[in-house]
């Protein structure tokens, strides 16, 4: 069917005829999921004869994750229900609506059984979404059916947002009954001392600061270190009585590793020697000032060194061991990029983010937690945008690992070029949550930070970088723009700290 090799299992979806070119291109990022953690699997995607064709070697049924322009919500990855491979095409928009209604209904039922108070506004939205979906099924015209299904999908997303708000309100209320102000860290990464005039504002918004100390920025050439800005930033944070952490020391990306290290492709032993030397040097320098370290980030799904996944797990463990050799009392955390496992849709990867983390934790090393990157709306390091319900579910998945989880946040406030951002990272291709504007960034920051902070297993939430005027990863992702003006997101985070945290 559709010219796919016979060894592949195939399903197809009829695509609306009026879909924009960019939305059609994003459909090629779709994937079929599998496994107990419902992570994406290697999926071949094609658009032919008005159909999205998905093929893979594994013939088991599974949900399909599809980037889709959801009315009033943005361009978001949206799940279907579990679908089987078959010759007859599915109706794409109808399956997305069915999948979202099902996802919201199931999560609502789970939380109700766990003690969540019924929410009439959620009930009403689900009823409306179901009614509109039923109307779509009865339409004889394919175009009319698509319009109705799209509206059902939009209403289901609104129901999901209402459900998350009800869940957050009740969880915060219960937690504040025991503790008026929570101990959770809310911080921002600082590559240098904050700009003049920001000192007091920073301390009002955040109770913590994280210094990246990333290998590429500190030791750009072998044995030649740039300590001045890092020393000043660490001393500034210590003098302000902020909780001081650092990392990621080893970021497995072209923007995180020095050029002389990137040349060691396929040489894990040579890489390990240089890596451990760097970790020992940095940890020794800041011993007594920094007690919590994000030792690595982005090892899962990384191919920059042409090193296999098992070697990357071993290298993460070796980096941690090098730090513990300096101080066995250190709290060490390792980071996970693309927590939904977007990279698994490409061939060459087997370990989902959850399996990668679980494997490391089962090694017996006393890690103090894991960090999950919620860098949404950028590509290739970031994840394609999800809604709050999808974010809550993936965070709860990592919560079952039994160690504290910290969350790193980043979302762009604009879509154009950013001279100081990682040249490999772009807003194009990452979807969008409502929009890529300063106002949308502020709403995103408040919504996603609040969701993370309400979870009892979350130990800290950190914004990716403070200012767009210095080198950074997420394009336009700072809380201060390149001209030195505070963005609205800064005040939204300050309000969260004031309401909920010490």
Model regions and ranges:
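Boundary/entry segment of secreted carbohydrate-active catalytic domains
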Residues: 3-27, 171-208, 212
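Long amphipathic alpha-helical scaffold segments
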Residues: 131, 135-201
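Aromatic-lined carbohydrate-recognition surfaces of secreted/lumenal glycan-active proteins
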Residues: 182-190, 292-295, 315-351, 372, ...
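Short, acidic/polar
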Residues: 190-203, 230, 272-283, 347-360, ...
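Substrate-binding cleft and catalytic face of glycoside hydrolase catalytic domains
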Residues: 208-220, 231-341, 412-419
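Aromatic-rich peripheral "rim/lid" segments of glycoside hydrolase catalytic domains that contact
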Residues: 285, 299, 304-318, 322, ...
